[in-house]
Amino acid sequence: YALWIIMGEALARKYKATGDKRYYVDPHVAMLGIDALGFRRGAGALATLLQENGLADHPLFAEAKIRGIRALAGHAESTDVTNDVNGGPSGIGIATAAGKAAFWDMVGASMEGPKVIAFEGEFAMTEGHAQELKTQALALQVGKRLRVMFSDNNAGIDDSLLGGVIASKYDHYSLVDQWTSYGWNVFTLDDGNDYDQVVAALKTMEDWDPKDRRPMVVVGKTVKGYWPCVSHGKISGQCDHVVGYPSHPYAMKMNSEYFVALAKTFEEQYGVEFVGIRQGAVTDTRERLIQFKANIDVAMSVLERNGLGDWLVERLVAIGDTVKDDAKLHFDVKHDPFQDDRLRVANLPVEPQKVTVKNRISGVEKQVSIALFRKPGEIAGTRRGISEIIKWMNYVTDSRFITLAADLSESINVEHGSLWGHYDPENNPLGTRIKAAIQEAGNVSTAIGLVSQSASVDPEKFAGVWALSGTYGAFTPLMYTPARVWSQQNQDSKFRMGVLHILAGHSGPETAADGRTHFGIFATQVWKLFPRGQTIHLNFWDYNDVAAGYFAAAEIAARDPKVGIISIEVARPDFPVADRAKFADTDLKAAAKGFYVIRDFAPGQPKHGYIVTQGSSSTVNLVSILPRLEQAGINVKVVAAISEELFDHQSEAYRNSVLPPEARYDLMVVSTGTRRMWPLRDVGPLTDAYSLTSDWDNQWLTGGLEPEVIAEAHLDKESVLKGIERFANDRTTRLNHQKSLLSAL
């Protein structure tokens, strides 16, 4: 933040003094001295901070009248204009670096630029997703485009790494050897605080042979708590220099002896004097703000001395003049193919297609078969539809949909979504299937890196790729933290970015013989733990739901920048494709509406309630027993729940026609998921008591063959029949119980 404030202030002062537009930076983009007040403060509090303390018209704070005070997150975020990632969870930003670099290879940018430079330290690199970067970057062969500046200061917050977490006797724990063993191009610096050594390393990397596809890392020995004016371990000749993890500033008090000693060296170096720091801590908020801003101005006044500010702005302008936006890339950067009308649900072909695709690099043509929908009775589970929607997406977008799966590409049916095979930056840059290790966190981080880039010079338009990372549903929580931080970045981004996809393949108890470690019952619920409307979660039960439901979500996400994630849940088994002519809603593309009616109430007969069904085996078995329910005189309305988010996008009239508000109090759920989280919100107080879910007895399932596991989950046909019979027979009791609860208020 300090660096960006210094640069912003230098330019602002020069523009004010000269009026020369070469020095102008939009204050809504620049960081200014006033923004130091925003460090670790929220935007809401900053909006009224000065007014509440009687400082709104104080001359020290006049800069705030330009555009307020910028909130500077405690861990740097992309909104700060300092980073292309959101920081916070250790290593979360650098984990995306391989994907960012690979994007520019995919779009055909020269190896001379853009380049991706990542900064990280040794403690953060012990984090799992950060460690996985080592494999990710080499697998993607990003070469010199990715340059990691690795600060080895052997200091965290609570301890040292070597000699602390790792005992000193294990002297073979070598950070340099770790990077080398992963195949990286490794450089070392004896003193990472020496600018000459750092610049020499940067120059070496810049001049390196672009044909060398090893990613680069510079490991420099640094000092946490480094200060340039130290003599014999003392600051200002009086205080011991505090280094290592004890120097973490959180515990330092305002205007403490050590702080004053540090400030004194700055005063002596630049001939300035800070205000009030030798009178101890300031307890009055108003006076503390005044002292703080006054001393920020003292520091910034150095820009007016000895031509320092003039040198800095001329250097910044010269650098800015070298930035070009006319790089030759493989595709049109002014057109967003994800908004192509062929991707709209209404325009999806219902018959199998045989399309001709042309490799824009090699010129080779070939034909590709795509079946977005299948005939009733054909045997095909929902996972079979995944490769087809990816193929259609790549056909329409000219191979702009990238997939990474944790050594499961064939198994979870993303393998054949690539029209041109596996990606290789040199031999097959148009391949969209990235070969990936079993690194769920690393894979999703790479996918995030890919979708976070855009070649468009218009911040309102997107010119990039979409990406999907997939694994067993049970393992997808490993992807959650990177995806959560990505969602936060996407929410506030000043630039239109791509859409991250999470594929929870082999979800539900249907994973069966793999054992309960692989059941995606509870695990997949994490994909609902986002602000409403910022993700779209899809849970498919029938093959013909997949294309309609997915492209409805894609149609929204391509046009609403708030939607940064689409998560998809499918199960392993192959079932006969449903005959929708027998449904109340016969629309082949009904899944696009989120919820749709499988069976409506029979007219002229007593109603027994609403059933919301979700998941493959649960819904297939429920649909199969509908004739038996009718024979028994049970009159229920059955609603398939594909996506609550898609349902929310429908008109109120449609929503009420499917599930009127009162239905929540006369409703049960049949789901392969969990009773801890329902397919829709605001269900009634007795929903839990009558619903059928995989955790019906609040126990982990065991395992076995698929029919055995489904029976244990009480989602087999007979269990579903008995559960619905109980629900229907108890209707009067259910409703009376709820009435009594209300009357007791």
Feature roles, as predicted:
Residues 125-129, 476-479:
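Active-site-adjacent loop/helix micro-motif of nuclease/hydrolase catalytic cores
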